[in-house]
């Protein structure tokens, strides 16, 4: 896939950026409006170090947005199946 065509590589629409650094960005997902963490590099390969960093950053944002223990990290790739990204979703959501 040409990375210029990947919506998570270009991130032309940025809603409510919660955090960003050279490796990742956390912003509100345009389709479901919950915090979404995106690894900047177009990859699905996840090292242990990447997993630890992504989990820690998204948990910190989730605690701020939803409160302690009121959210979970959804690691399922849906609309963009080939670019690593996760969502912080409310525990009150019915779909998992």
Where are these regions (language model features)?
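HIT superfamily nucleotide-processing domains
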Residues: 1-96
């Amino acid at each position: 896939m040409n990375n210029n065509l990947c919506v998570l590589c270009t991130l032309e629409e940025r809603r409510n950026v919660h955090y960003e650094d050279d490796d990742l960005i956390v912003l509100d997902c345009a389709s479901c409006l919950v915090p979404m963490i995106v690894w900047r590099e177009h990859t699905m390969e996840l090292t242990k170090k990447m997993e630890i960093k992504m989990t820690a950053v998204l948990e910190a944002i989730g605690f701020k947005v939803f409160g302690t223990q009121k959210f979970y990290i959804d690691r399922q790739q849906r609309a963009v199946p080939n670019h690593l990204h996760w969502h912080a979703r409310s525990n009150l959501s019915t779909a998992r």
